[in-house]
Amino acid sequence: MNMNATLLGQAIAFFFFVTFCMKYVWPPLMEAIEERQAKIADGLVAADRAAKDLNLAQANASEQLKEAKHAASELIEQANKRRAQIVDEAKAEAQAEREKILAQGLAEIESERNRARDELRKQVATLAVIGAEKILERSIDKDVHAELLNKVTAEL
């Protein structure tokens, strides 16, 4: 193999080409590749962080949902207790009102009965006086006396 000037010129040109590429072309390419690698790594880290944040958010959401359900069930339970209390109070008030009305009715009946008795006593007394006057006006005769008593009792 003969080494001639062309081969030597090509070797020198290749050496300058490699040196030029190593000094001016290679660093920007490596920098672009490294930037790309850094972006990819940052993206992977961000994706991992986002996945963790998503899991945390889902856990928080499920916890808040449980708390909301618990609070809602407590509210429903309190509402049911209050409803039962209101119903019981209404029943007690209705019972008290019923007893009050019944007592008033019984008192009114008793008052009316006493008034009727007093009126009847007055009438009986009046009739007895009238009967006694009639008996005294007439002669004392058993038949007339019995007849007058029958009339008085009939009037009673």
From Swiss-Prot:
Q: Name one GO cellular component term.
A: proton-transporting ATP synthase complex
The UniProt GO MF terms for this protein read:
proton-transporting ATP synthase activity, rotational mechanism; proton-transporting ATPase activity, rotational mechanism
Q: Does the keyword rRNA processing apply?
A: no
Keyword line: ATP synthesis, Cell inner membrane, Cell membrane, CF(0), Hydrogen ion transport, Ion transport, Membrane, Transmembrane, Transmembrane helix, Transport
InterPro entries, sorted = ATP_synth_B-like_membr_sf, ATP_synth_b/b'su_bac/chlpt, ATP_synth_F0_bsu_bac, ATP_synthase_B_chain
Q: Where in the cell is it found?
A: Cell inner membrane
Q: What kind of membrane protein is this, topologically? A: Single-pass membrane protein
The protein's superkingdom reads Bacteria
Regions that span the bilayer: 7-29
- Tell me the Gene3D superfamilies matching this sequence: F1F0 ATP synthase subunit B, membrane domain (1.20.5.620)
Which family does this protein fall into?
A: Belongs to the ATPase B chain family.
Q: What does this protein do?
A: F(1)F(0) ATP synthase produces ATP from ADP in the presence of a proton or sodium gradient. F-type ATPases consist of two structural domains, F(1) containing the extramembraneous catalytic core and F(0) containing the membrane proton channel, linked together by a central stalk and a peripheral stalk. During catalysis, ATP synthesis in the catalytic domain of F(1) is coupled via a rotary mechanism of the central stalk subunits to proton translocation. Component of the F(0) channel, it forms part of the peripheral stalk, linking F(1) to F(0).
Q: What does the record note on quaternary structure? A: F-type ATPases have 2 components, F(1) - the catalytic core - and F(0) - the membrane proton channel. F(1) has five subunits: alpha(3), beta(3), gamma(1), delta(1), epsilon(1). F(0) has three main subunits: a(1), b(2) and c(10-14). The alpha and beta chains form an alternating ring which encloses part of the gamma chain. F(1) is attached to F(0) by a central stalk formed by the gamma and epsilon chains, while a peripheral stalk is formed by the delta and b chains.
- In its UniProt entry, what is this protein called? ATP synthase subunit b
Q: What is the lineage of its organism?
A: Bacteria, Pseudomonadati, Pseudomonadota, Gammaproteobacteria, Vibrionales
